[in-house]
Every structure is written in C-alpha cells, then in structure tokens.
Amino acid sequence: AGWRLEIKKYPLLTEFAAWRTDANWKKWWNGGRKYLRFDEPGASGGYYTQDDMKEIIAYAQQHYITIIPEIEMPAHSEEVLAAYPQLSCSGEPYKNADFCVGNEETFTFLENVLTEVMELFPSEYIHVGGDEAGKAAWKTCPKCQARIKALGIKGDKKHSAEAYLQSFIITHAEKFLNDKGRQIIGWDEILEGGLAPNSTVMSWRGESGGIEAAKQHHDVIMSPN
C-alpha cells in the first residue's frame, strides 16, 4: 500500500501518498490505513524517483528483462484519493477506494500519470489493473450516475450498470494507450463489458477468466490464485 513512483505533475503522490503511519503492513492495515507527509514523525515508506527508475530500466534492459509498470484503476486507489480526494466520489480522503468515473478530472489525472509513465518505460505493455472495484459509491454518486445516463448504459442479466461503467474507464485508458502505440494488460475483471482484441488479460481468479479471454481471442497470462 502506498504510491511508489515519482510523478512530477502530482507531487503529493510521493510527498504524502508514499508514506504510511506504520512500517508493519498488518498493523497499518488494521489500524486505520492512514498516510503521512514524508517529513512527519513516524512516516514510513518511500518511492522511486524517475532517475532511480531510469537506472533500474537500463539495468533490466542489459539483462534482457522488460519492466512492465502497473497503474491501478479504478480501484485500489486509496493512497491517490488520500492525497487528491477530489478524484473520489465523496470528495473526502479515506472514504473511497475507487476513482469517481463521473469526474472529468479523474481522466485528466490518469492520462497525465500514464503520459509520464510512458516517457519512462519503453515497454509495449502497460498494466492498468482493473481488479476488485467495489463500485458501491458509484451507485449513489451523482456524477457517476450522470455518466451512466449520458452513455446510455443499462444493467442486464450479466452485469450491473456500474460494472459496465468500469468497462468505460478501462476502454478509455486502452484507447489512450493504443493511440500512443502501447497495449494494455489488465486483471480478468476487465473482460466484463468488452475489450479491444489486442488487450491482454491476466487471469488471477482461478483459471476461468483466462479460458474466457482465450475464447475471445485475447492473449492471456495465467496467474491463478
């Protein structure tokens, strides 16, 4: 837990969201899951500067290794929302784990972060996460519900409208990255709602997600739990 890569456009990610209140993860997880500024007493954490990462990438390339970065969306974003709470549905820190998909600033943030990531990482692939989105806040968020209405999204027997809203943010990131010559990898939840054929699915919830992705002619990485 915590943000681990310097993003120059968003300094609070490493001044604040990279530092937990406890070095022991279990104690931190069960003790409120709060973050501190790097210069506050008790702050525990750290991050890679962009210069650090350039050095690591160069070393990896010398050893024929490609480093693929992961920028998680729309869930597992508590640390981002602690630093930039306006990107959450509530507008408050420590209330939500998912980005507000009805907020245009969310997409600006993600595109800016991905741009800096692409400037650092030569990998053809960028992992966009996509797993374990709770979506509960989206059901009562006026902005998310307005987005659902504007897109004409309807729930059906397979998935809720909010599940298809997750597909919207993933396909938005996919198009943004494809336009820059990159391809996405995502956890198997990204299958819900449809994907472009060049997307790679990483199956972690057993083997069924990978099988379904292969049936849809996607490349698959099997990593079942």
What does each model-identified segment do?
Residues 1-182:
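Substrate-binding cleft of carbohydrate-active enzyme catalytic domains
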Residues 142-147, 187-198:
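Active-site clefts of carbohydrate-active enzymes
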Residues 127, 179, 195-202:
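Catalytic cores of carbohydrate-active enzymes
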